[in-house]
Amino acid sequence: IEVLLGGGDGSLAFVPNDFSIAKGEKIVFKNNAGFPHNVVFDEDEIPSGVDASKISMDENDLLNAAGETYEVALTEAGTYSFYCAPHQGAGMVGKVTVN
């Protein structure tokens, strides 16, 4: 599944921001707008036993240009919350359910 970082209208959002995938399915997060964004999974809102640092970008790493991507495959079933570190305060958050 492809998830856009930044709405086509310039909004600070993940599109889609709530979705489901199969276990092991690849998520491609793609910068849509050319603003600096990243993808960080919330260590308190992922299945227990999953290491957030292994599935997240470093909070200081950014996808700066439109078209840049970050890919991750989630192998444990459950619900994962994620956010864009620079824009979390603006509501740039999302959730994925792994079946």
UniProtKB/Swiss-Prot annotation:
Cofactor(s), by name: Cu(2+)
Gene3D superfamilies registered for this protein in UniProt: Cupredoxins - blue copper proteins
Membrane topology, as annotated: Peripheral membrane protein
Plastocyanin-like domain ranges (all copies): 1-99
PROSITE patterns linked to this entry: COPPER_BLUE (PS00196)
GO CC annotation, single: chloroplast thylakoid lumen
Keywords, in A-Z order: Chloroplast, Copper, Electron transport, Membrane, Metal-binding, Plastid, Thylakoid, Transport
Main localization, broad class: plastid
One Pfam family per UniProt: Copper-bind
The organism's place on the tree of life at top rank: Eukaryota
Keyword Translocase set for record: no
InterPro entries, per the entry: BlueCu_1, BlueCu_1_BS, Copper_blue_Plastocyanin, Cupredoxin, Plastocyanin
Residues annotated for Cu cation binding in this entry: 37, 84, 87, 92
Keyword Chloroplast tagged: yes
GO molecular function: copper ion binding; electron transporter, transferring electrons from cytochrome b6/f complex of photosystem II activity
Subcellular location: Plastid, Chloroplast thylakoid membrane
Function of the protein: Participates in electron transfer between P700 and the cytochrome b6-f complex in photosystem I.
The family this protein is said to belong to: Belongs to the plastocyanin family.
PANTHER family named among the record's database cross-references: PLASTOCYANIN MAJOR ISOFORM, CHLOROPLASTIC-RELATED (PTHR34192:SF10)
Protein name according to UniProt: Plastocyanin
